Amino acid sequence: VVLIELGGTAGEYQNIVYYEAYRIMKQSLPDDVLLVHVTYFPTPQHINELKSKPTQLSVKNLHAMGIQPDFIVGRAESTIDDKRKEKVAYFCNMHKDDVISNPDAESIYQIPLTFLEQKFDERILEKLKLPKKSAKIQSWKNLVDKILAKKTRRVSVAIIAKYLSTGDYELKDSYTSLLESLEHAGWHSDTDLEIIFIKAESLEKKTKKALEDLHRADGIVVPIGWGSRGVEGKISAIKYARENKVPYLGLCYGMQLASVEFARHVVGLEKANTKEVDPDTKHPVIHDIPFDKKYQTIKGIGASMRLGGYDCILKPGTLAHKIYAKHNAFKDKKKNLITERHRHRYEFNNEYRKKLEDKGFVISGTSPDDFFVEMIELPQKDHPFFIATQAHPEYKSRPLKPHPIFAEYMKAVLKYDNEHDRGTTSKI
């Protein structure tokens, strides 16, 4: 079964060609295609009643395009009662059982169970004329129980962010994969997680709130990013994590900037930088990938990115190797080979490998041809958990199976919370 999501609202001119494509597919293959129409049932506060008119109008727009939805999934603050289901079904040419209630829930992971109670899965199989199957849902129920259960521990993780503000609002959507990956690890370690978003630019300005938030964090994450805005704030947070032995996880840009921070403050290359920020830097520790035929991954205009899944060889004895070995996550254990997803156009400059390694910098993962630096870390004798990767492990974490890096990062954060005396930490 292939799922295709068409965003926006019914009738938007940008989506007309897709609606027409669906209409033709449904006409040609009536038993192989179905449409689930997600609509909103508002509840005006002054009358406290679910209203179905917006849904009726939305379906009317679909009818005007020759489309009849097979299901309506109604988003609402509360459960859609039978009376309103019957009303919607009557005006939208549907069976009442094909109007599915999708009320607000404490956790989004409860929603599959809500659908199961309404036999949504059985109705889909029936309409697609597929064999009926019993849903193997127990592991999911156990997960939901873990999510909703009162946790025995609570920790704080700071994410040094730059994609938060939009007008008067602060949204976390840009970091959804990262947030979910941290939550996955928290659920499976019986830990309640407080996420502290710290704007990188606030760290550059050294605002009181930003510094206080950084100093109270049990772990620090520097995630994906582009461009120069907020870079020095991110680097200052990395320096703080390194010097104070706060568990650190760097993702993509977080690995590149960790390399820059080490080059500046440990190796002594004061002008070290990434060419993305300073094209004329004296010490380009991070530079753009030489996209010759060997490393060209995208054809055409803007062909400048290493995108998709790539293999990596881990160095035995390193933290990275121990993490993947512990979770049996090797693609090929004999070759110490793993695979992770990527999205970057800059990379570690191999001319600086020896200079950094001579000062204790550990390159724990490289591409099979030893060209790309994929993972870096600090020796565990110097720092309990400082690891960064050019890849995006957050894209492979799953609710029932947290990514190994996030699972072990959470353990390090818990250990720090239990052992660390915040009164002795230094300031950035």
Predicted feature residues:
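N-terminal beta1-alpha1 cap of cysteine-dependent amidohydrolase-like domains
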Residues: V1-D382, P393-I428
